[in-house]
């Protein structure tokens, strides 16, 4: 889990555009965020297994 201060810091608009970065909406993780879904890979996996993300299922071939 991310620190509360980092979550608050993310909500502010940065002075320079290159300083902006994505953060998981669910847990606050800054790395491995899937921008299409807005969550990190770990939360995405949990939500996909739970069936909370429509159209996503476990691949098997």
Curated annotation (Swiss-Prot):
Q: Name one GO cellular component term.
A: small ribosomal subunit
UniProt superkingdom: Bacteria
Question: Which InterPro entries does the annotation name?
Answer: Ribosomal_uS14 (IPR001209), Ribosomal_uS14_bact (IPR023053), Ribosomal_uS14_CS (IPR018271), Ribosomal_uS14_sf (IPR043140)
Which GO BP terms apply? translation
Q: Which UniProt keywords apply?
A: Metal-binding, Ribonucleoprotein, Ribosomal protein, RNA-binding, rRNA-binding, Zinc
Q: In which residues is Zn(2+) bound?
A: 24, 27, 40, 43
One Pfam family it belongs to: Ribosomal_S14
* Cofactor(s) named in the record: Zn(2+)
Cofactor binding notes = Binds 1 zinc ion per subunit.
| MF terms (GO), sorted A to Z | rRNA binding; structural constituent of ribosome; zinc ion binding
**The protein's assembly and partners:** Part of the 30S ribosomal subunit. Contacts proteins S3 and S10.
Q: What does this protein do?
A: Binds 16S rRNA, required for the assembly of 30S particles and may also be responsible for determining the conformation of the 16S rRNA at the A site.
Q: Which NCBIfam families match?
A: PRK08061.1
Task: Give the family this protein belongs to, as stated in its UniProt record.
Answer: Belongs to the universal ribosomal protein uS14 family. Zinc-binding uS14 subfamily.
Report what the protein is called. Small ribosomal subunit protein uS14
Species this protein is from:
Mycoplasma pneumoniae (strain ATCC 29342 / M129 / Subtype 1) (Mycoplasmoides pneumoniae)
Q: Which gene encodes it?
A: rpsZ
